[in-house]
Amino acid sequence: MAEPQPPSGGLTDEAALSCCSDADPSTKDFLLQQTMLRVKDPKKSLDFYTRVLGMTLIQKCDFPAMKFSLYFLAYEDKNDIPKDKEEKIAWALSRKATLELTHNWGTEDDETQSYHNGNSDPRGFGHIGIAVPDVHSACKRFEELGVKFVKKPDDGKMKGLAFIQDPDGYWIEILNPNKMATLM
């Protein structure tokens, strides 16, 4: 008997599960710690991710010999950030799901510099996702702040979620985890 195909022509649930292995016990303490985006202008990006999305800068690292800086952001209380430099670095790199912004010095002044967001050919990286309590309220605030939208919550076939863009054009999905079951 042929395996039933999902409407998309992709893998069935069973086929997807058959491709997966049980986690090796040695990976028990692994965690997805960060995703990195290259940014042209750290001033614009830091403003966007802190003021618009409410993230906290939890660590900054400069590499003068290689002329770049790293900015780690997360949804953390700034009062919890250790003061000691080494402790702060270890703490920042042990947080779950941080966003690392990488700035190569000088790109902010280069008119021709831009980064590919992965949503046009050649496609690759797609987006990051931010969970919010109320998508419509969050998007109303984003509109008031002049944030660029790719998709508003009531647009398209997938109602109730939105996509906005950061200063470099990276897409950010805005979703409510409790409402996603109706879309999937």
Curated annotation (Swiss-Prot):
Binding site for Zn(2+): 34, 100, 127, 173
Pathway(s) it belongs to: Secondary metabolite metabolism; methylglyoxal degradation; (R)-lactate from methylglyoxal: step 1/2
Cofactor requirements of the protein: Zn(2+)
Coiled-coil regions listed: none
CDD domains reported in the protein's UniProt record: GlxI_Zn
Annotated positions binding substrate: 34, 38, 104, 123, 127, 157-158
Key words, A-Z: Acetylation, Disulfide bond, Glutathionylation, Lyase, Metal-binding, Phosphoprotein, Zinc
Pfam families (alphabetical): Glyoxalase
Cofactor note: Binds 1 zinc ion per subunit. In the homodimer, two zinc ions are bound between subunits.
EC number(s) reported in the record: 4.4.1.5
Catalysed reaction equations from the record: (R)-S-lactoylglutathione = methylglyoxal + glutathione
Cysteine-cysteine disulfides: 19-20, 61-139
Chain positions found as N-acetylalanine: 2
GO molecular function per UniProt: lactoylglutathione lyase activity; zinc ion binding
Modified residues (N6-acetyllysine): 148
Gene3D superfamilies: 2,3-Dihydroxybiphenyl 1,2-Dioxygenase, domain 1
Domain VOC span(s) in chain numbering: 31-177
Modified sites of kind Phosphothreonine: 107
InterPro entries reported in the protein's UniProt record: Glyas_Bleomycin-R_OHBP_Dase (IPR029068), Glyas_Fos-R_dOase_dom (IPR004360), Glyoxalase_1 (IPR004361), Glyoxalase_1_CS (IPR018146), VOC (IPR037523)
Quaternary structure (record): Homodimer.
Protein name: Lactoylglutathione lyase
Record lineage: Eukaryota, Metazoa, Chordata, Craniata, Vertebrata
